[in-house]
Amino acid sequence: IIKQGEEVERMHTPLAYLRAKIRSADEDGAVSVRQLEDTDAIVIHDKKERIVTYIYEYEGKLRELYASEEVKPMLSAGTSLFTVYDFEAQENGGLLQVSIHDEQGKASRMMMELKSE
């Protein structure tokens, strides 16, 4: 039971973090998904500060990178947040879908409606 609880928490925590991060930044046009070096990335624009936050998977870790709008992001430069496998993000018609997998291939997913579009 403890092991099962740890597995659920390990998969829930990254998705809860993403949900909170996106909700706190979601305003018209601020959140999108794009490819960085063939990797899905959630992109959050802070238009006032002209800062972009990228959230993506690199080398088995969910990472976060803050950069100026003018700087080309490098995946290796992000701060490691959580161990995840096979991170996928899609945005379609104002609906953000994210899935992550654990080391056994079990998927956890979330969907959020975005204010942006």
Where are each of the predicted segments found?
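Membrane-proximal N-terminal amphipathic helix
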Residues: I2-S32
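N-terminal non-globular leader segments, chiefly Sec-dependent signal peptides
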Residues: I1-E6, Q97, H101
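Detector for methionine-enriched segments
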Residues: M11, M74, M110-M112
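Type IV pilin-like appendage domain
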Residues: E37-L95
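General N-terminal targeting signals
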Residues: L15, K72, T79, E113-K115
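Low-complexity, S/T/G/P-rich flexible repeat/linker segments used as non-globular hinges
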Residues: V84, Q90-E117
